[in-house]
């Protein structure tokens, strides 16, 4: 089955796993998903992830979710730029999420990074998702 929005699918799987208090979630692997997971791990929203072989030459990511005092560290995670409606932002138009408590993840010419890093490096790009 073809998937029209692989990143949106991963975010939905994470959201569903959090609502069911799961410790891990499995999602198909891709380079973009790996970069987004790297940012989430670096910012402390997930414990980590492992690439596992699912057979037939395909790989999956096993994502270990992070909880603090029996509640998820991720309160909301939402897709912004979608396949039917791409959202691009310049450096000046990157807004803070929850007054700086959350992050936006952007795909820029310099790689996938947070809104803080994009402002520091003075680059804009596609606004992939917001996490709080």
From Swiss-Prot:
**Keywords, alphabetical:** Ribonucleoprotein, Ribosomal protein, RNA-binding, rRNA-binding
Q: Which domain of life is it from?
A: Bacteria
Query: Where are the annotated coiled coils located?
Result: none
Gene Ontology biological process: translation
> What InterPro entries does its record include?
Ribosomal_uS8, Ribosomal_uS8_CS, Ribosomal_uS8_sf
Does the UniProt entry include the keyword Ribosomal protein? yes
Heme is among the record's keywords: no
Q: Which GO terms describe its molecular function?
A: rRNA binding; structural constituent of ribosome
Pfam families, alphabetized: Ribosomal_S8
Q: Which Gene3D superfamilies does the protein's record reference?
A: 3.30.1370.30, 3.30.1490.10
One GO cellular component, as annotated: ribonucleoprotein complex
Q: What does the annotation say about its assembly with partners?
A: Part of the 30S ribosomal subunit. Contacts proteins S5 and S12.
- Report the function annotation for this chain: One of the primary rRNA binding proteins, it binds directly to 16S rRNA central domain where it helps coordinate assembly of the platform of the 30S subunit.
Q: Return the similarity comment.
A: Belongs to the universal ribosomal protein uS8 family.
Name-wise, this protein is Small ribosomal subunit protein uS8
Organism listed in the record: Bartonella bacilliformis (strain ATCC 35685 / KC583 / Herrer 020/F12,63)
Q: Which gene encodes it?
A: rpsH
